[in-house]
Structures are given as C-alpha cells and as structure tokens.
Amino acid sequence: ELGSQTLGLLGFGHIAKAIAARAKAFGMRVHAANRSTVMSQHVDRMFALSDLHAFLAGIDIVVVTLPLTAQTQGLVDAAALQALRPSAWLVNVGRGPVVAEQALYDALKSKHLGGAIIDTWYQYPTPTLPECAPSKLDFAALDNVVMTPHMSGWTSGTVHRRQLTMAATTSVDRLSDD
C-alpha cells in the first residue's frame, strides 16, 4: 500500500518535483535530499546531501534523479546502500554512475536491498561497440531487479519528435546522394 510508504527523492529538480506531486496524491510521505534547500508543498521533510545516510535510513523507496557530476558520481555507495532498510527499493532514473555499480549489485544479490528498478546504466552502445550489456555485472540474473532500457523519460511526443528527426535525416541523406 503506497499510502503507508515513505518516498525519498535524491535530487529535487523538475522530475523529482513531478514525482513528489504524484506520490502525495497516493498519500505517501515524501522526503527529499538536495544540494540546496527547496521548499515544496509536496515534501514533508527536506535533507541536505551531506545528511544522505540519515535521509536514506527512513525511506521505503528511493528515487535517484540526480545528474552525473564529479560530486554525484558514486554518491550512493556501499555505505549509503547499507543505510537503507533491507526492504527498501531503489529506482534510478537519473544517471547510472550516481549509484556505485558493484555496491548496488552486491546489495541486491545479498538481499540487503529489497529490489531495484534501473532505467539508467553503466555502459551504453557506441559507434565502435554498437551492442553491449548495460553493465559488466549480471543484474538480469537477479530476481529483485527490473531493468528498462533508459526510456523512463520517453513520451508519445518524444517518439513523434524522434520519428520526424529520422524522417528528415533520411530525406536529407537521399537528396544529398542525388
């Protein structure tokens, strides 16, 4: 039951604010941790990033929405994951490397973490490596992980814009070949 859960938002930008509003509609308690204090009618308690472990200790579901910067890379490390309740879930829609890859895998495999929904990854295809696994670790073998292919931000509008871009690119390519 969502109404009895505490949602933690790691980062409080546009995406997290939208998630907070929806969580409150379900009656959830909402906590947020951010580098700067931001007031919101949808947040019951705000934490500084320097209080990360205290923030995580009271969370049932943590949603990582942080961008990848020198300050955020590996922010959610083994110690941070240990601060979470064993029944907690981690959802990453920010950037993969904000959460330490090996630490996350180990916490999930040992069942110290209830589960994870991962939409952002550690490895992506490149022109020289068009096919690659999303991680060097076998997250797919774990029964407490839901994996999505970095698509949480996609909407029908996103798909439509991409289709138009592809059509325009194809048309330009064909015209330039003539």
Residue spans for each PLM region:
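Rossmann-like dinucleotide-binding domain for NAD(H)/NADP(H)
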Residues: 87-178
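Rossmann-like dinucleotide/phosphate-binding beta-alpha-beta segment
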Residues: 1-86
